[in-house]
Amino acid sequence: MNKHQVLKQYFGYDEFRDGQETLIDSILSGRDTLGIMPTGAGKSLCFQIPALMMDGITLVISPLISLMKDQVEALNQAGVHAAYLNSSLTASQYYRALAYAREGRYPIIYVAPERLVTEEFLDFARNTKISMVAIDEAHCVSQWGQDFRPSYLKIVEFIERMEVRPVVSAFTATATKEVRDDISDILMLRKPTVLTTGFDRPNLYFGVQAPKDKYETMKNFLELHPGQSGVIYCLTRKNVEEVCEKLRADGFSVTRYHAGLSDAERQKNQEDFIYDRAAIIGKDRKSGSAGMPRPIS
């Protein structure tokens, strides 16, 4: 299949969005590639489509377990065999997934950066054809970025230890020059195609208000938008709990997400929001929005 057929058969789209085709063509030509695209612009398709056209396995490096799980589930539902390797798996599940990967069952494998330089994973990678390493949320490699993760520095070590260097692609919604340069330098991209798409988001409105009663103002806003979804950011976990409790008492479908909850509860609450079991989710400001691929009304 060509790229247009893959786009239609697996993802249901007739046309590519701005920048997607250029980035896909760059990867398929064997060039390292850096895509800077706003959230919701379809970054994932830029590495998923080439992955389905290349001979071998694509490793997708992702920082969040929840994000891996959501993307793998979406791929499986679309008819693409994909798997993830991270700390949420038991030892038996992890080794079974590796065994299936060796058999060629998965063209796409999502993996946590911490796993890359473990001996069992290195052994797998050295004895398997890895066509591409795609780094999602690539700004995590940069100390200029607000989401710097030291574990992302393991990516370069992993690539250097492979016998045959794969194509390397990196994607982020962070567009500052410092972060962009950092990504290219730290990941040692070789003469990469670099593409930044437009960041104009006509569907978004930003407003600043200072109401006397914040809760009543928020409640009135929600009542004016029945049946719509949204994220409410609070300064602290305590604020999240208080706001969610009040909203539930007032009859709103709401859940919560913050670091004070167990991994299992955070995952359940996130899935409740993503799959429409809860219209509203309250989060503290440190939680961010990565890993919640749901249209916000």
Predicted regions and their residues:
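Short, Lys/Arg-enriched, disordered terminal segments
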Residues: 1-2
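Helicase motor core with emphasis on the C-terminal RecA-like subdomain
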Residues: 5-10, 14, 18, 22-44, ...
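Conserved Rossmann-like nucleotide-cofactor binding loop
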Residues: 66
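Short "domain-exit" segments at the C-terminal end of structured domains
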Residues: 291-297
